[in-house]
């Protein structure tokens, strides 16, 4: 949340505090269209060793505008379900390779033991379009919901979207971690690494840490499944953290040298050699990493799910409808969504905390979304 706000302010005002900024798939096409960041593909590819064609198509496409690359991907991710195999075995439960959300809810109830600080599932409750909003967005999609219909009428109060939001709130409230509204990615990962949660639905990117016995004492007792579904399949998100070059930068040559080095084919091997482990390398962006014998061996427990998830996502048609007017899986790719997502997730956090009902939170979000459609000229 903090880096997004700081970078957005700097780029939008042309302050030029930074030369290189860390951005994601939501910002890149929007900022490229506004001329805030430079096209970087031709300069990076001027180096014969760089090979931007090595980036996964879904990652490259998400960081491009009109086929031109505007940010160099550091790592990429979809979403998945991590779980403790030992706890499942003890309870006589079996996680399917592709679970449904109804199955996940049943598992969470069965494995929830708060008296012993073991929680059924950890889900992000921290407000923020890229925090709580990311996993919640995939739940909305797979339940058959969406933010807007073809005519840009807000759909938050539609039966499908309402069901998805209430399901998410109920799941984390009844069988999730305490203080969920303060839990983002980092907090949930900490709980998972400490052995306090039986399941964790989040990005595929922490697989490298989760399955590294040097960083996770439970690494030999976990497994990974595909993102859960209900109606729409598949349901994983798509994201990449990438380096973009501010158009107002006065140090572009140095900036390019950094981007080329940090997103090169050789960088993951450098990290592994420097740390003595593959558990800290940036993954999910370059195909060549998965051809590296060392990483292929390390990632054998999770690479098949990660690679298949990245291959099957469709940000152009993430909902259960053919006429959805926006692009994006866990976000709506319009400039106003950053504020809209933040405001709505704040309301949903209020419902999680018990300060208002889920119905009231949903109604408020519906109003915010309608205002955006009208004031933004979409409707």
Provide a role label for each language-model segment.
Residues 1-55, 64, 90-92, 189-191, ...:
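Extracytoplasmic "Venus flytrap"/periplasmic binding protein-like
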Residues 9-10, 16-19, 48-87, 119, ...:
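A structural signal for short loop-to-beta-strand junctions that line the ligand-binding cleft
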Residues 65-74, 79, 103-154, 166, ...:
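Extracytoplasmic/periplasmic solute-binding protein
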Residues 89, 313-379:
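Conserved C-terminal helix/tail region of periplasmic/extracytoplasmic solute-binding proteins
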């Amino acid at each position: 949340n903090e880096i997004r706000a700081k970078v957005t302010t700097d780029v939008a005002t042309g302050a030029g505090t930074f030369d290189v900024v860390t951005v994601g798939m939501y910002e890149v096409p929007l900022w490229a269209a506004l001329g805030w960041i430079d096209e970087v593909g031709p300069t990076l590819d001027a180096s014969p060793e760089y090979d931007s064609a090595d980036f996964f198509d879904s990652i490259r496409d998400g960081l491009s505008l009109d086929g031109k690359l505007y940010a160099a991907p550091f790592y990429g991710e979809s979403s998945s379900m991590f779980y403790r195999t030992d706890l499942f075995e003890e309870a006589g439960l079996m996680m399917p390779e592709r679970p449904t959300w109804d199955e996940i809810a049943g598992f969470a109830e069965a494995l929830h033991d708060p008296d012993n600080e073991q929680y059924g599932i950890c889900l992000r409750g921290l407000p923020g379009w890229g925090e709580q909003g990311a996993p919640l967005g995939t739940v909305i999609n797979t339940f058959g919901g969406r933010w807007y219909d073809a005519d840009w009428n807000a759909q938050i109060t539609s039966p499908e979207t309402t069901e998805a939001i209430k399901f998410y709130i109920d799941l984390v409230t009844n069988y999730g971690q305490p203080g969920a509204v303060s839990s983002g990615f980092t907090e949930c990962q900490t709980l998972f690494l400490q052995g306090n949660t039986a399941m964790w639905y989040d990005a595929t990117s922490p697989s490298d840490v989760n399955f590294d016995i040097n960083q996770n004492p439970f690494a030999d007792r976990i497994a990974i499944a595909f993102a859960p579904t209900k109606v729409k399949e598949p349901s994983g998100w798509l994201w990449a953290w990438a380096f973009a070059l501010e158009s107002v930068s006065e140090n572009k040559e140095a900036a390019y040298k950094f981007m080329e080095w940090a997103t090169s084919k050789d960088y993951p091997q450098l990290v592994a050699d420097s740390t003595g482990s593959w558990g800290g390398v940036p993954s999910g962006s370059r195909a060549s990493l998965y051809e590296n014998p060392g990483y292929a061996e390390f990632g054998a427990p999770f690479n098949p799910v990660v690679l298949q998830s990245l291959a099957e996502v469709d940000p152009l048609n993430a909902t259960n409808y053919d006429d959805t007017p926006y692009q994006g899986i866990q976000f709506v790719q319009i400039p106003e969504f950053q504020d809209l997502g933040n405001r709505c997730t704040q309301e949903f956090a209020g419902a999680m905390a018990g300060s208002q009902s889920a119905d009231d939170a949903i109604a408020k979000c519906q109003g915010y979304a309608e205002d955006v459609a009208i004031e933004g000229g979409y409707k």
